[in-house]
A protein has these predicted regions:
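C-terminal peripheral helix-coil segments that are non-catalytic and often amphipathic
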Residues: 1, 141-145, 161, 165-199
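Hydrophobic alpha-helical connector segments
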Residues: 63, 77-104, 159
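Amphipathic alpha-helical segments used for helix-helix packing
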Residues: 90-126, 168
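Amphipathic alpha-helical packing segments from all-alpha helical-bundle domains
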Residues: 117-160, 168, 179-182
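Short hydrophobic/aromatic patch on the recognition helix
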Residues: 44-54
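An amphipathic alpha-helix adjacent to DNA-recognition modules
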Residues: 12-20, 32-33, 53-77, 81
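Hydrophobic/aromatic residues within well-ordered alpha-helical segments
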Residues: 14, 57, 64, 68-72, ...
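Basic, helix-initiating cap at the start of DNA-binding domains
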Residues: 1-29, 38, 42
Length: 199
């Protein structure tokens, strides 16, 4: 029996189906216990079809992260609704969404998982301040009231601290977690928005 040939549209639809079902498996099992077989079965395909799209489970998760990035930018465009800029309140929602999004892959990864992903990534998941600055500049270009003197390194680090806090929530005092997050977001907003406009 010859292998099924997919059109470009079918390939994209199938990949999206695998990403969405794989994300749910990641939430349920974590990366360690999420197998290629489980991903294939949940998407209604065979393992050999999965292997035509991805080199490994790690490759799948790296591409899932890229897929989520595309969904994030689409969500920003949807919020804009044809406008040039988001209000400060909407901009704060976007920054909060980066951290508190239930579909963020990072919160379901362990440090060991992240090491495996770094090893599987072509660039070793190297931190690149120029690339991060470009991404933040692009994002802040859609925000009203952004400071003229944004320190992109500090903002990037604050976003990482917020992400690490969310990922390691279990080692923090649960009763103070929301208040801690509020304080950290307050600091972040103060670094992004002009004085008097970050309320």
């Amino acid at each position: 029996m010859s292998p099924k040939l997919f059109s470009i549209t079918e390939k994209e639809q199938l990949k999206e189906k695998m990403f969405l079902s794989g994300l749910e498996l990641l939430k349920e099992y974590g990366m360690t216990h999420m197998s290629v077989e489980k991903i294939a079965a949940s998407a209604g395909i065979g393992k050999s079809t999965f292997d035509n799209f991805f080199m490994s489970k790690e490759d799948f998760v790296l591409q899932l992260i890229g897929f989520n990035r595309m969904r994030f930018w689409k969500a920003v465009q949807d919020m804009l609704g044809g406008r040039e800029k988001l209000t400060i309140a909407e901009s704060k929602q976007v920054l909060t969404m980066i951290i508190n999004n239930k579909d963020s892959v990072y919160q379901y990864l362990t440090p060991e998982n992240e090491e495996k992903l770094a090893a599987a990534s072509p660039d070793g998941n190297k931190l690149d301040i120029d690339e991060e600055t470009d991404t933040l500049r692009r994002l802040f270009g859609y925000f009203e009231g952004v400071r003229g003197d944004v320190d992109f390194g500090v903002v990037s680090n604050l976003l990482k601290i917020l992400a690490l806090t969310a990922e390691n929530k279990t080692i923090l005092h649960e009763s103070a977690y929301d208040r801690t997050q509020e304080k950290l977001f307050g600091l972040l907003f103060g670094c992004v928005f002009k004085e008097g406009e970050n309320e």
